[in-house]
From Swiss-Prot:
NCBIfam families: PRK03992.1, proteasome-activating nucleotidase. ATPase which is responsible for recognizing, binding, unfolding and translocation of substrate proteins into the archaeal 20S proteasome core particle. Is essential for opening the gate of the 20S proteasome via an interaction with its C-terminus, thereby allowing substrate entry and access to the site of proteolysis. Thus, the C-termini of the proteasomal ATPase function like a 'key in a lock' to induce gate opening and therefore regulate proteolysis. GO terms for biological process: proteasomal protein catabolic process; protein unfolding. GO terms for cellular component: cytoplasm; proteasome-activating nucleotidase complex. The gene is pan. Residues 405-407 are annotated as: Docks into pockets in the proteasome alpha-ring to cause gate opening. Its main location: cytoplasm. This is Proteasome-activating nucleotidase. It comes from Methanococcus maripaludis (strain C7 / ATCC BAA-1331). The keyword ATP-binding applies. Belongs to the AAA ATPase family. Residues 22-67 form a coiled coil. Homohexamer. The hexameric complex has a two-ring architecture resembling a top hat that caps the 20S proteasome core at one or both ends. Upon ATP-binding, the C-terminus of PAN interacts with the alpha-rings of the proteasome core by binding to the intersubunit pockets. PANTHER family: 26S PROTEASOME REGULATORY SUBUNIT.
Length: 407
């Protein structure tokens, strides 16, 4: 059977088109496959680079772990630029060489160094040792109490500003007059009169660093620990200068020295002598101010009270009627009062200190809450004064000592 020529030509053309279409399809599939492989290759390359980086980090960490530990030592004497006498932590003294990576200027007696285990050569100089207990005494966040929050102590605030705040903010005034600024102030008075509050206000008002120490923290069990802590506190203060050191309850460490032979008393006396030396010893104290507080000035050692250590001794006495009124205004500023005469409250609150007046305000608020009121009236304050006065009378067996001490 024969086909027309035109029909045969169409068949051949269709075959050619089909073949060409298959080839194009195969090429497109191959190009798509190549593109996918290229993308996959990029991902693999990226992962390979990341794995190599991690491998290098792990190798470095492994090398660090393989390095043998170094021996700690203390420089006793520098012989020349490349040799020094070292006391190792294992006990004996050695004459050792300096590594080429160590600056000879850093090799001074007392410096802490690292020694190679095999050759005992000095390979590194460590920073000065710091007592973590002294570091913890620095206050990072300053209190939010200013002098405006303290009532009835205007003269005392003026005195403490002249001794502590003025030398730090305007030292040129003392240079013009030609005098050395005072360096210390002792606050004494009955409990609750605002001694610690004044120190908090000083920390708030000045931009100086503030180190707070409680006297009992300086009394340690073993010989030399208390004196070392005192040295470290003053060393920290010098590094952070201008700085204020506040020693609360200083009578715990600065009581009068006696002939007592007990080990505990001797250690307290050693700590006191170190404190005296740091306050006004051979080395200059620099721009470091000291504020101390106590409610037992009668038992303090006379040596610590002399000028040069505490240039100004400020009595924080019981507030008078006007002082009590100022304190009440501060504590009742945010309270919802109704028909309350604060002057009358101040008259009724005779022989009360600032802490007592704050307790009175709190108790008055509690009486209002007890009666489901949103405001405080005069009767609440009267009941609160009676309650606080009753508590103080129950503890009257402690009062004769305070009466004798503060007149």
């Amino acid at each position: 059977m024969s086909y027309p020529d035109d029909y045969s030509t169409d068949i051949e053309k269709n075959k050619m088109d089909l073949k060409e279409f298959k080839e194009k399809t195969q090429i497109a599939e191959l190009e798509s496959k190549v593109l996918r492989l290229e993308l996959k290759n990029k991902d693999v390359t990226r992962e390979n680079v990341q794995i190599k980086k991690e491998n290098e980090i792990l190798k470095r960490e492994l090398d660090k772990l393989r390095i043998p530990p170094l021996i700690l030592g203390t420089i006793l004497d520098k012989v020349n630029e490349r040799k020094a006498v070292v006391k190792s932590s294992t006990g004996p003294n050695f004459l050792v060489n300096l590594s080429q990576f160590v600056d000879p200027e850093d090799i001074v007696p007392g410096a802490r160094v690292c020694l190679n285990q095999q050759t005992l050569a000095i390979v590194e100089v460590l920073p000065k040792e710091k007592d973590y207990r002294a570091m913890a005494m620095e206050i990072e966040e300053k209190p939010d109490i200013s002098f405006e929050d303290i009532g009835g102590l205007n003269n005392q605030i003026r005195d403490i500003k002249e001794v502590v705040e003025l030398p730090l903010k305007n030292p040129e005034l003392f240079e013009k007059v030609g005098i050395v600024p005072p360096k210390g102030v002792l606050l004494y008075g009955p409990p609750g009169t605002g001694k610690t509050l004044l120190a908090k206000a000083v920390a708030y008002e000045t931009n100086a660093s503030f180190v707070r120490v409680v006297g009992s923290e300086l009394v340690k069990k073993f010989i030399g620990e208390g004196a070392k802590l005192v040295r470290d506190v003053f060393k920290l203060a010098k590094e952070k200068s201008p700085c204020i050191i506040f020693i609360d309850e200083i009578d715990a460490v600065a009581s009068k020295r006696t002939e007592s032979l007990t080990g505990g008393d001797r250690e307290v006396q050693r700590t006191l002598m170190q404190l005296l030396a740091e306050m006004d010893g051979f080395d200059s104290r620099g721009d470091v101010k000291i504020i101390a507080a106590t409610n037992r000035p009668d038992i303090l050692d006379p040596a610590i009270l002399r000028p040069g250590r505490f240039d100004r001794i400020i009595e924080i006495s019981m507030p008078d009627e006007d002082g009590r009124l100022e304190i009440l205004k501060i504590h009742t500023e945010k309270m919802n009062l109704k028909n309350v005469d604060l002057r009358e409250v101040a008259k009724l609150a005779e022989n009360m200190v600032g802490a007592d007046l704050k307790a009175v305000c709190t108790e008055a608020g509690m009486f209002a809450i007890r009666e489901e009121r949103e405001f405080i009236k005069m009767d609440d304050f009267k009941e609160a004064i009676s309650k606080i006065t009753g508590k103080k009378e129950k503890c009257s067996y402690d009062m004769p000592q305070l009466t004798v001490m503060y007149g």
